[in-house]
Regions:
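Serine-esterase "nucleophile elbow" of acetyl-processing enzymes
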Residues: 1-61, 71-80
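Active-site segments of SGNH/GDSL-like serine hydrolases
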Residues: 87-91, 112-143
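Structural recognition of the beta-strand scaffold that forms the well-ordered cores
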Residues: 16-18, 54-59, 83-87, 122-126, ...
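Catalytic-core regions of hydrolytic enzymes
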Residues: 60-83, 97-107
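Surface-exposed cleft-lining segments at the edges of enzyme active sites
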Residues: 26, 58-64, 90-102, 132-137
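Charged, glycine-enriched surface loops/patches
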Residues: 101-125, 148, 152-158
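Non-membrane alpha-helical structural segments and their capping/turn regions in soluble enzymes
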Residues: 34, 66, 98-109, 139-147, ...
Length: 215
């Protein structure tokens, strides 16, 4: 994570990309409120006065790791990013699709390599847990897919933001952070943003974008 933190010490503008599925896309389930990428943008470009930084979301609802690979050149490479935040897995762990666990892990490794080949830093993220007992096509497989994210990040010595573990550590709030079985609401996106701030050492309790009430 130190490689990412150093960007905040530089006067050079930084290009940040957030890549993933509907959870990062932030559509529908926030009901018009800011998603975690928009909150990150507020914190970085306004509150930290990094006005020349560019923050791009190229996440697409319904996507999976195979889709991220297939459209990588258009959605990531053309922008020549400095940092790529990757959050994926909720659709991969769906038993109704044809992405097996081994392919998921392989896709993660290939994504990490492709991001690294651009000279960018990949930041792996686990995603929000599924509400207990819901989404039976996903729930039994979710933990193993999150473990794959942790393993690839560890094997490649990549930064990891472990939202899944953080949410499990705050299990009493889990229900209040969700819009349905596996999509976070606006409060869930605030929880995402706050953990990112803390992991990057840019959390400030006096900041407007850091001090939102989260149930």
């Amino acid at each position: 994570m130190e490689r990412v933190k150093k960007f905040f010490e530089s006067d050079a503008p930084v290009k940040w990309i957030f890549y993933g599925d509907s959870i990062t896309h932030g559509a529908l389930h926030t009901f018009g409120q800011r998603d975690y990428v928009e909150l990150f943008s507020e914190r970085v470009r306004f509150e930290l006065a990094r006005t020349m930084d560019i923050i791009i979301t190229t996440a697409i609802s319904g996507d999976n790791s195979r889709g991220l690979l297939n459209s990588f050149d258009w959605r990531v490479a053309q922008f020549k990013p400095d940092v790529v935040f990757l959050m994926i897995g909720m659709n991969d762990c769906n038993a109704d699709n044809d992405i097996e666990f081994d392919e998921f892990e392989s896709n993660l490794s290939e994504l990490a390599a492709k991001i690294g080949d651009l000279g960018a830093v990949p930041v792996f993220q686990t995603t929000c847990p599924i509400l207990p007992g819901q989404a039976p096509e996903r729930f039994p497989h979710f933990d193993s897919y999150m473990d794959a994210i942790r393993k690839v990040a560890s094997d490649r010595k990549l930064p990891l933001i472990d939202h899944a573990q953080y949410w499990k550590d705050h299990a009493d709030s889990h229900f209040y952070w969700m819009n349905n079985a596996f999509h976070p609401n606006a409060d869930g996106h605030r929880a995402f943003a706050q953990l990112i701030y803390r992991c990057l050492d840019i959390y400030d309790e006096n900041s407007h974008s850091c001090r939102f009430h989260i149930p």
